[in-house]
Amino acid sequence: MKIRRIVSTIAIALSVFTFAHAQSFENVENNAKVFSLHLGATRMIYKPNSSGETLAVINEHNYPILVQANVLSEDQKNIAPFIITPPLFRLDALQSSRLRIVKTEGAFPIDRESLQWICVKAIPPKYEDKWAKEEVSGKKSDKATMNIQVSVSSCIKLFVRPADVKGQPDDVAGKIKWQKVGNKLKGVNPTPFYMDIAELRVGEKEITETHYIAPFSSYEYPMPVNGGGDVRWKVVTDYGGISKTFETGLNI
């Protein structure tokens, strides 16, 4: 009898706890949002002797955001010798603006392209932010709020193309040589352009890793199991489109 009373008491306590716990979650408002910007291009070609290039930035959210932009080195670990103006600014809801990118210093090779990255980050407003106070005021809730906000940096390739490098990547993309090295497919790029591989197949097998191949360099892709036959590939063009299909035999 004593054991039965103890069990009953525990059951009642658990019921009260579960009810209170559920009630507490009813008063919690969950907000999970991903914040990003839409950029007006997927890549940019920069002529070293130019006065600069511009890039459109669009805020597709229905509230203002802060836009933070910079140019990074190829490995995205260091600041590149460029300035972006403005580097930090408010962009109102459903509005667009333009960034100006200008080379400041630094010597780039004159016989090949160099790769940098333009990275633009969207910083969303918080209730206490004075710069967005008029948009978020009056939006407090009686409920507790659990906010999960993820700011995403949008990065596009910035190709520094010297005057001595003529034409476009898709003009010479057919010169890439392919060979089987162990369980890898090695692509050799004998051109001064970055070859941004958009699609790659060995026979009927697709290689999903579409990493670029730097100028006068090579890159090894994972070879498909039982892959064999001709290699077919496409590259990304200067305007962000996809080139025609190139095809060649596989050197073993």
Swiss-Prot record:
Signal sequence, start to end: 1-22
GO BP of this protein: cell wall organization; chaperone-mediated protein folding
Alphabetical list of Pfam families matching this protein: PapD_C, PapD_N
Keywords: Chaperone, Fimbrium biogenesis, Immunoglobulin domain, Periplasm, Plasmid, Signal
SUPFAM superfamilies reported in the protein's UniProt record: PapD-like, Periplasmic chaperone C-domain
Location, primary (coarse class): periplasm
Subcellular location: Periplasm
GO CC annotation terms, alphabetical: outer membrane-bounded periplasmic space
Transmembrane segments: none
Family the UniProt entry places it in: Belongs to the periplasmic pilus chaperone family.
Role of this protein: Involved in the biogenesis of the AAF/I fimbriae.
Protein name from the UniProt record: Chaperone protein AggD
Native organism taxonomy: Bacteria, Pseudomonadati, Pseudomonadota, Gammaproteobacteria, Enterobacterales
